[in-house]
Amino acid sequence: MIVVGLIVGQPLLVCGQTGNEALVAPPDDWSQFRGTPALTGVSSAQVPQNLELLWTFDAGESIDSSAAIVDGTVYIGTYLGELIAVDLETGKPKWRYQASEDAGIGESSPAVGHGLVFVGDLAGQLHAVASDTGDGVWTFQTEGEIKSSPVVVGEHVLVGSYDGYLYSLSATDGALIWKYETLNYIHATPAVADGVAYFGGCDEVFRGVRVADGVEVFNLSAGAYTAASPAVIGNRVYFGTFDNEVLGLDLLSQEVLWRYEHHTRHFPFYSSALNVDGKVIIGGRDRMVHAIDEQTGEEVWTFMTGARVDSSPAAADGRVYVGSGDGRLYVLDLETGEKIWDFDTAAPLFASPAIADGKVVIGSQDGVLYCFG
């Protein structure tokens, strides 16, 4: 492990709070991938039980990037390399920013903070763009593709790259604070809790790195390639692997508490976990959504879709929202897994839902952004 950069000694704030308080996204905002830096995927918004399609926006190219929603504006990236701001109420575009002429924005999802929108592209650049005007403010070049989503923690912006480094940059000017070296690609987005960034990688190691100075404080073999981002709550962390397992780890003892694998369907987990009401809920490439008891690792329920589920589920008001490669957005009962509602977009959904202001927003592979409410 190599750490390069400055040591920043000021206290960390996560969404204006310390410790593990910021586990649920506020009702009106979904400021980054999975809603909060802890990546729990939970919103406090009240969403209508019977959803209706409010509007669509044609972005012109496929959308793998998951939306951020702040102050009534939706931010989304596309494979054309554009970062687009769209009005949440009307679906009308506010501005477009061209991130790269040569490479698109893949799965890196925007994060909003300090009046800026941060997003990575497949040319390896992290972009900071003024949230109100769409003007570029700064860029930072890495040596590999960025599919990881940026996370804003106080004055730090964290992002992983396919060059094997986790970077911490100054939110205001993009200056390098530190970088932490792993042994392979970093695809996952780091989850931050109690001042530590937790993430897995393609080197089969799950790590915790202190945000203040980039020093490693947690290291445990995951036993498999990990593309999924973790969810952290309390002293537990949950994530899926390409060895067809979901793991529950104890952050204090640095031990694996349980491993979940479906008894008949043995497929990788690319989706990032949702952690809510004692359940870990995750999509699988076996076409299923799995709900797992967070204490025991035992199956609670499963729901079968028509194709792989790479979309990461989100929850609000007792319901689970998730997209599938079959083109449908599903709404499931959190307790039973029974289908409440679905909508056929007619194109695969690999992006993840964003929930804010009573609305659910998701992009599709045919470049259409959908808003339901």
What do these predicted regions represent?
Residues G9-P48:
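Sequence/structural signature of beta-propeller modules
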Residues D87-G91, A130-G134, S170-D173, R210-G214, ...:
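Short loop/turn segments that connect beta-strands within beta-propeller blades
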Residues M1-P11:
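Bacterial N-terminal signal peptides
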Residues V24-P27, R34-P37, W55-A68, P93-H114, ...:
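Extracytoplasmic beta-rich repeat domains
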Residues Y79-G81, V86-L88:
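Beta-propeller domains
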Residues V42-G60:
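A short helix->beta-strand "capping" segment at the edge of beta-propeller domains
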